[in-house]
A protein has these predicted regions:
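Hydrophobic alpha-helical membrane-insertion segments
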Residues: 20-29, 145-162, 254-260
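Membrane-water interface segments at transmembrane-helix boundaries in multipass membrane proteins
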Residues: 141-206
Length: 359
């Protein structure tokens, strides 16, 4: 047990060690090669009012007059000291921008993640329990349509229905106009959060529905389900009880592993609904060639995705304890294939791994 957790943590830590520098190098290279002038993107229409001397002074203040590789190593040296640099787009430290905008993105992605899991897994279980009947066909058709539908089309459809025609929900920002964060109530945040969460969660339910349905049908057609039916358990109770536990174990892993896609979808949702999170900051930094802010957001994204994968492995092993034993069982056959290993050594290895050796 302890060795399994140790191997898992070491594997994720090693992946983080090489993935963070690689992400930083690739992203900094792409930003440096982008045909965007950061000074012009920052000044905008007033660029004609700035002379060459002023433009050179701004570039020198931002360090843009130096080669890209020198700027990268300067950024890396400051990163080791805990300084992510200054954002060109917001004229503020990158760490300040991340701290101010990360809670809004976390609320959006967290609510969307939970809503997508509850709705997707519930509909997947219902489709498997009604296999071959009209609820199954209806849910499968809806999941396939949602899976291939563009996210921006879903967002615009919800805005047209709930914000324009019915006027039930707001379609912009996190608060009503003229209301500050100190004056706002929780229900005002909630009303502005409904449409972005609805868009982001529905977009992620399609693959989850199909996955849960397939896993549950495989369990219901297996020997364990036939054994339970012989003991008098009905198909509905079987699907909602042990079958759903079997399917939801892998569904948690699949859903947590899609956190990277969830962040990518949040960029689109925050842009369409003007939600003040990291997604909106990503678009502004990309269009303004704001390399320090893009690098800061990329590092946060990589850490969040790796933590999601780690949590997926932990929850999957907690739901299915066989996953904690499998890595040990896979080592024994490799030892048996070594001809120079003595039989006594193989027996000791099998005893230590608590696996019964074959005669």
């Amino acid at each position: 047990m302890n060795s399994w957790w140790g191997r898992l943590m070491m594997k994720r830590l090693c992946r983080l060690v090489w993935l963070l520098p690689l992400t930083a190098v690739l992203l900094f290279t792409l930003v440096s090669l982008a045909p965007i002038d950061p000074v012009q993107a920052y000044v905008g229409a007033r660029m004609s009012m700035i002379g060459p001397e002023q433009q050179a002074a701004i570039e020198a203040a931002w360090g843009l007059d130096q080669p890209g590789w020198i700027r990268f190593f300067h950024w890396l040296a400051h990163l080791v000291q805990g300084d992510l640099g200054d954002s060109i787009s917001y004229n503020a430290p990158v760490l300040t921008v991340l701290v101010e905008r990360f809670p809004a993105s976390l609320a959006l992605m967290g609510c969307s993640f939970l809503a997508a899991f509850v709705v997707g897994s519930g509909l997947g279980v219902l489709a498997a329990a009604c296999q071959g009947r009209w609820p199954d066909r209806l849910i499968r058709g809806w999941a396939m349509v949602i899976s291939v539908s563009p996210g921006f089309w879903i967002a615009l459809l919800f805005i047209s229905i709930f914000a324009v025609q019915l006027a039930w929900l707001p379609s912009c920002c996190a608060l009503p106009p003229g209301v500050t964060q100190d004056e706002a109530h929780w229900w005002q945040y909630g009303r502005h959060l409904v449409l972005p969460v609805l868009t982001l969660s529905i977009y992620g339910t399609g693959p989850l529905i199909l996955h849960v349905r397939q896993r549950l049908i495989g369990f219901l057609d297996g020997p364990s389900a036939r054994h339970l039916r012989l003991h008098g358990m009905s198909s509905t109770r079987l699907a909602l009880g042990p079958g759903s536990r079997h399917a939801l174990g892998s569904a948690v892993t699949v859903h947590l592993a899609s956190i990277g896609e969830l962040f990518g979808g949040s960029v689109l949702a925050e842009t369409i609904f003007a939600w003040p999170g990291l997604g909106q900051a990503t678009v502004k930094a990309a269009t303004g060639a704001d390399a320090p802010l893009l690098l800061g957001i990329a590092l946060v994204t990589v850490v969040v995705v790796l933590l999601g994968n780690l949590l997926a492995d932990i929850l999957a092993a907690w739901v299915d304890p066989r996953l904690r034993i499998m890595p040990q069982e896979e080592t024994l056959p490799r030892l048996k294939r070594l001809p120079w290993l003595k039989a006594s050594a193989r027996l000791k290895t099998a005893s230590r791994l608590k696996v019964e050796p074959k005669s």
